From Swiss-Prot:
It comes from the Bacteria. It comes from Yersinia pestis. Its main location: cytoplasm. Pathway: Nitrogen metabolism; urea degradation; CO(2) and NH(3) from urea (urease route): step 1/1. Gene3D superfamilies: Urease, beta subunit (2.10.150.10). The lineage of its organism: Bacteria, Pseudomonadati, Pseudomonadota, Gammaproteobacteria, Enterobacterales. One of its GO terms (cellular component) is urease complex. Belongs to the urease beta subunit family. The keyword Kinase does not apply. One of its GO terms (molecular function) is urease activity. It is found in: Cytoplasm. Its EC number is 3.5.1.5. It catalyses: urea + 2 H2O + H(+) = hydrogencarbonate + 2 NH4(+). It holds the Pfam family Urease_beta. This is Urease subunit beta.
Length: 144
């Protein structure tokens, strides 16, 4: 058994019930994903909360920001967390592209399909311009 291993084991053994054993190095996530920052303003009269994996392009229509820049992206925050936008507040948020197949369905049904860039998989035809037009028709605010 190495000295490092026994030190770790002794830390765990000497930790009181309910105590915490922290890693020696910080935990990171989404390190290699490109980040897009957008300024968001809540034009509504109520707070709006957006979860970590909600397609940001399709968030509440009272949030005003560059929706085209948010197409295919989500908040760069840890899973199961959210950001709250108070009425009248303006804040800048970091967005990252969805991982995996980048096929998004539901939310506010503005996209319902592939949101990636480059070669189109499975004969899907992303239509970003149609989604932007549909968002405008349905009253989703955009700063551009």
């Amino acid at each position: 058994m190495s000295a490092k291993k026994s030190t770790k084991d002794s830390k765990e053994q000497n930790t009181p019930l309910g105590g915490l054993v922290l890693a020696e190095t910080p935990i990171t996530f989404n390190e290699n994903k490109p980040v897009t920052k957008v300024k968001v303003r809540n034009t509504g009269d109520r707070p709006i909360q957006v979860g970590s994996h909600f397609h940001f392009f399709e968030v509440n229509r009272a949030l005003e920001f560059d929706r085209a820049a948010a197409y295919g992206k989500r908040l760069n925050i840890s899973s199961t967390t959210a950001i709250r936008f108070e009425p009248g507040d303006e804040t800048e948020v970091p967005l990252i592209p969805f991982g995996g197949k980048q096929t998004l369905y539901g939310f506010n049904n503005l996209v319902d399909g592939w949101t990636g860039e480059g070669v189109v998989p499975n004969s899907e035809r992303p239509d970003k311009l149609a989604a932007i037009r549909l968002a405008a028709e349905r009253g989703f605010k955009s700063s551009k």
